Regions:
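Structured interaction patches on ligand/partner-binding surfaces of diverse proteins
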Residues: 84, 113-154
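Bacterial Sec-dependent N-terminal signal peptides
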Residues: 1-4, 16-49, 153
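Glycine-centered loop-to-beta-strand initiation motif
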Residues: 40, 89-97, 241, 249
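Short, ordered, surface-exposed loop/turn motifs in non-cytosolic proteins
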Residues: 46-72, 198-201
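A short, solvent-exposed beta-strand micro-motif common in secreted/extracellular proteins
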Residues: 95, 99-122
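A structural motif detector for short, solvent-exposed N-terminal "entry" segments of globular domains
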Residues: 45-48, 52, 155-213, 301-316, ...
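Short, acidic Ser/Thr/Gly-rich low-complexity loop/linker segments typical of extracellular
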Residues: 66-95
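Solvent-exposed beta-edge/loop recognition patches
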Residues: 226-427, 435
Length: 436
């Protein structure tokens, strides 16, 4: 048994990724006369030794614009028939996709490294828990004009966290009389390692959820060099005594550790929760038998001392550790503001152990608004959302099951990309995960 120690590589956010999103809104695709070929150049992480190849990696491109067409894929690209194509990089790190409709695309890839592979690639000792390498670009314009110019896809590398955010239930539900219900919300964290882990003192940060958002990623990069994340609340697992989380198991954090199962089929008995965010709010009944989460910081005043998990999102979450007094950290009223009624906390990106970017559905586009991402690529290269912008659907977002250990323990999907790692369900129960 050991107290988990963690360090995170501080990686620079790509200005190129930001600029491509801006360009996408300025290009007219209606004059495109033919299908085009797309060449993607995958560049190795900065930590790799000079000349170390990325190897054969699968790159995925997904058309996110509205342009229609019947393009086919040949060469190294393979079409899935769903607006998504996959291609494998060659010895130079290049993947070619032929017959693409000029439009806007998301491009991504990810792969794992063992500690030994990390040592071989970087020349530095690696963590036994392994590493994730990810690369992504959102809203990349593809036009005839840039057909001959490779799209640069920069990879970043980070340790695989042993403790991960595994489930978020923020949607709420409706009872038999169609009345909305919110007290049954909860968060789960999962010990992905093979050893018990002392998680006492762990901080759980809820990302700011304002509209418009307090800082866009571009603004955070401009003002804080991409080294801060903005949160509205921070809760802490009490640090006064050890809390050992067994290997391959879940810690359940709730707003009301009571039995909610009589409200609807989407609510559950949460009396077995590990920790509860105590509140004087009349809608949230406290359970004195369940330990209290410590409210370490809040943008809001009482009685909003429960976890402010927004029904339809955004509802992003980070977890981190620090020995510092977080109340002394820099706070902000928002981009360009020096005064205001709501003050938010700035968390150093370098200490974040895991993060999930949970976005709100855009009713106009039918998907999430990627421009509202709160987390950098090296924390979460993707995002997750539920089907309703207003919530009350009973939907839970949860990590896919990647496999099992020799003794039957769960291995949850963790590629640092929530678009890959998470699914949405209305039936999955607390502390349970799918088999895949």
């Amino acid at each position: 048994m050991h107290k988990y120690k963690y360090s995170f590589f501080t990686l620079h956010f790509s200005l190129f990724t930001l600029l491509t999103g801006l360009l996408a809104s300025c290009i007219d695709y209606d004059d495109a006369s033919r299908l085009v070929n797309v060449k993607v150049q995958l560049n190795a992480p900065a930590e790799y030794l000079p000349g170390t190849p990325v190897g054969e990696q699968v790159i995925t491109i997904t058309k996110t614009g509205t342009k229609t067409g019947t393009g086919t894929s040949t060469g190294t690209g393979t079409s899935t028939g769903t607006g998504t194509m996959t291609g494998t990089t060659d010895a130079s790190g290049i993947a070619v996709f032929e017959g693409c409709m000029p439009d806007v695309y998301d491009i991504s890839t990810s792969w794992e490294l063992t500690g030994a592979e990390y040592l071989a690639a970087t020349g530095k000792p690696g963590s036994a828990n392994g590493y994730m390498v990810t690369a992504s670009i959102s809203e990349q314009p593809v036009t005839e004009a840039q057909e001959q110019t490779p799209i640069m896809l920069q990879a970043v590398i980070a340790p695989k966290p042993a403790l991960i955010i595994s489930k978020i239930y923020c949607a709420g539900s409706r009872d038999a009389n169609n009345k909305t219900y919110i007290p049954g919300k909860y968060i789960e964290l999962f010990n992905q390692s093979d050893e018990p882990m002392d998680i006492s003192g762990l901080y759980i940060g809820l990302l700011e959820s304002s509209s418009p958002q307090v800082y866009s990623l571009a603004q955070l990069n401009e003002v804080y060099n991409g080294e801060k994340v903005v949160v509205k609340q921070v809760f802490q697992i009490p640090a006064d005594e050890p809390f050992l989380l067994p290997a391959r198991s879940t810690v359940l954090l709730v707003n009301s550790a009571t039995d909610h199962s009589d409200v609807s089929e989407h609510e559950y008995d949460l009396r077995g929760a590990d920790f509860e965010a105590k509140s004087t709010d009349s809608r949230h009944e406290n359970n004195e038998a369940v330990k209290a989460l410590t409210l370490a910081f809040s943008t809001f005043s009482a009685p909003l001392t429960y976890m402010n998990l927004m029904q339809g999102g955004p509802c992003g979450i980070i977890i981190f550790n620090t020995d510092e007094d977080i109340t002394t950290w820099e706070k902000t009223y928002g981009y360009g503001k020096t005064t205001g009624t709501l003050s938010y906390l700035l968390v150093p990106k370098s200490i974040i152990r895991d993060g999930v970017d949970f976005l709100k559905k855009n009713n106009t586009s039918g998907g999430a608004d990627i421009s509202t991402k709160r987390l950098y690529q090296d924390i979460d290269a993707g995002y997750i959302n539920i089907s309703s912008a207003s919530g009350y659907t009973g939907e839970v977002v949860y990590r896919r099951t990647a496999g099992t250990t020799a003794d039957g323990g769960k291995i949850l999907m963790d590629t640092n990309n929530s678009s890959n790692d998470f699914k949405v369900s209305t039936t999955i129960k607390p502390r349970e995960y799918d088999e895949e």
